[in-house]
Regions:
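Extra-cytoplasmic beta-strand recognition segments
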Residues: 76, 123-153, 182-185, 212
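Short beta-strand-plus-loop segments that form exposed binding edges in beta-rich domains
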Residues: 196-205
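C-terminal motif of bacterial Sec signal peptides marking the signal peptidase cleavage site
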Residues: 17-20
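Extracellular beta-rich ligand/substrate-recognition surface
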Residues: 111-124, 171-174
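N-terminal, intrinsically disordered, polar/charged segments of Gram-positive cell-envelope systems
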Residues: 25-66, 70
Length: 217
């Protein structure tokens, strides 16, 4: 009787152990899934400040379009920010998108639009063109909007060449009161130019950026 009882206990213990191994495997799988999901979430969170484009195009051949512009999607006529790396710094800008309201465009039918009601506006954008011929280039950009009473907003465009950055300030001076920024005399020695912009305003700031061109002088 004792042997039968002992045998039953041993069988039950083995069954529990086997079941426990199965559960442990399941828990490990779940933990691995959770870890992978967490890692994915962390990666997405790190990239969450970057406004994704459907396809990140880049001009690596130094070939201009039919208008002589070396930038891709300089007038934001694509449905996304193709060609540009647009970053919503600290995820504070509430609206940062392609705007299809022609009245808010400098040229074409769309523009880059930004707005924040409760948070500050803070975003940056850039695009690199490589494979350029030797010569001198000129960057031109247009911006309009309002800084919501911010007396010291950060609004500038830049050209980065050979590790040196040249800046030109922009202004938010009212609805469709466009301010044109120009940076002439850009002379790369390695065939590459990075152009971009940075905008920071108090809560309530809004505006659009449009028709950015990089042409050979």
């Amino acid at each position: 009787m004792k042997r039968k009882l002992l045998h039953a206990v041993l069988v039950a213990s083995m069954a529990v152990a086997l079941l426990g191994c199965g559960n442990t495997s399941g828990i490990n799988a779940d933990a691995e899934k959770t870890q992978k999901a967490t890692e994915t979430e962390n990666i997405e969170e790190e990239r969450g400040t970057e406004v994704a484009a459907a396809e990140q195009k880049e001009n690596t051949t130094g070939t201009p379009d039919e208008n002589g512009n070396y930038l891709i999607n300089g007038s934001f006529e694509e449905p996304d920010f193709s060609g540009w790396t647009v970053t919503n710094n600290n995820d504070v800008t509430e609206e940062l998108d392609v705007y299809d309201r022609e009245t808010d465009c400098f040229a074409g039918a769309q523009s880059l639009h930004f707005y924040s009601g409760n948070n500050p506006v803070d975003f940056s954008m850039k695009q690199t063109v490589s494979g350029l011929e030797d010569g001198t280039y000129k960057l031109t950009a247009h911006i309009q909007g309002d800084a919501a009473g911010d007396e010291n907003p950060t609004v500038y465009f830049y050209a980065l060449v050979d590790g040196e950055e040249v800046k030109a300030d922009g202004k938010l001076q009212g609805y469709v009161n466009w301010y044109t920024v120009e940076i002439p005399g850009i002379t790369p020695t390695d065939g590459a130019i990075t152009v971009g912009a940075h905008v920071v305003t108090a809560p309530g700031g809004w505006g659009t950026i449009d028709d950015i061109t990089l042409v050979k002088e």
